[in-house]
UniProtKB/Swiss-Prot annotation:
UniProt superkingdom: Bacteria
UniProt-listed Pfam families: Ribosomal_L34
Protein name stated in the entry: Large ribosomal subunit protein bL34
Classification of source organism: Bacteria, Pseudomonadati, Pseudomonadota, Gammaproteobacteria, Cellvibrionales
Entry keyword set: Ribonucleoprotein, Ribosomal protein
An example Gene Ontology CC term for this record: ribosome
Family: Belongs to the bacterial ribosomal protein bL34 family.
Native species: Cellvibrio japonicus (strain Ueda107)
Amino acid sequence: MKRTFQPSNIKRVRNHGFRARMATKNGRLVLARRRAKGRKQLTRV
């Protein structure tokens, strides 16, 4: 059986990167929440 996690940095960045977050209203809300919380890293990518 094929494993479900097939890592790819391109897919990772496109889905979870900073520019992906900035592209949608809800993504910007995610960043705003993380800024308000004082996160050192806004995105994991």
